[in-house]
Amino acid sequence: MATHAAGAGTAQATIEALLDELRRGAGAREIVGIGVGVPAIVDTAAGVIGEEAHNVPELAGVPLATALRTRFALPAFVDNDVNALALAEWRFGADRGVRSLVVLASGTGFGSGIVLDGRLIRGARGFGAELGHAPVKFDGPPCWCGGRGCLALYASGRGIAEAARERATTASGRALAEAAGGDPRRIDAPLVFRLAGAGDPAATAVIDEACRALGAMLGVVINGLNPEVIVITGGVAVAFAALETRVLAAAHEYAFKRARAGTRIVIAPGDKRSSMRGAAALAFYELEERKR
């Protein structure tokens, strides 16, 4: 099924078409609810996707949960995709059964999800786990969210690419520019990681900063939330897995010694099935919450 059509209404239509296909595939099996994770802030009480839906702007302001309930006559729940992913790790992952878990997802952007004492942390308006836009450098550059020095600027795919593009315009970044065919706009995170692995100084500086920024956030999470498990996942986590020693060394600089000793940090690159499990986990979680 094509999933990358663009324009007003196309994202909702794609979701509905996919759900139709899944319902046909379910056959006689009972469907108890629908879960959807979207890369945006979601007001879960109202079921409305927020204005910050930069990756799916056609969904901004859409009451998707209500629309799906009406369309399919089933309970339907919509939340941030990394919140859903955290529920999947908590319910289905290798560490299922723990009471507290934090997911940090480094992909194009940087998201996070928090489960404490068996409850998903959303905050008052759905902003409760936006650690990707917590500052790790108070005098850092402006972020696309409107803040400054956010973690996403340093440890997301977009942030790593943009930092490398800036360096590519300097003398020390000549190799970065050459690797991109002379066009800095073609620099992406995989290229930066590859050049850093080959020893290029400019690329190495970008990746060093990414590791330190991620380590600083691990320190914040360990000291502030004291979870049993932190899972680092997402498309960029594949590259961070090879740098695990550097990331953990940075985390050890910022976290209380006894607190970090009690927190297991796992770098586990996800896949599309992880997102599907997240959608299912969200529906199960919300249905169970109704019974409390």
Show which residues each predicted segment covers.
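Active-site-adjacent loop/helix segments that line or gate small-molecule/cofactor pockets in enzymes
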Residues: V82-A86
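Active-site glycine-centered loops adjacent to acidic/histidine catalytic or metal-binding residues
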Residues: D81, G107, A279
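Structural signature of FAD isoalloxazine-binding scaffolds in flavoprotein oxidoreductases
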Residues: F127-E130
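General beta-strand structural signal in soluble alpha/beta enzymes
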Residues: A76-N80
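Short beta-strand segments
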Residues: G35-P39, V102-G109, G113-V115
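ATP-binding/phosphotransfer module of carbohydrate and carboxylate kinases, centering on a glycine-rich
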Residues: M1-G33, D43-V48, T66-L74, A88-V98, ...
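A charged helix-plus-loop insertion that forms the helical arch/lid used to bind
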Residues: G47-G61
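Short clusters of small/polar residues that mark proteolytic maturation junctions
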Residues: M1-A2, A53-H54, R125
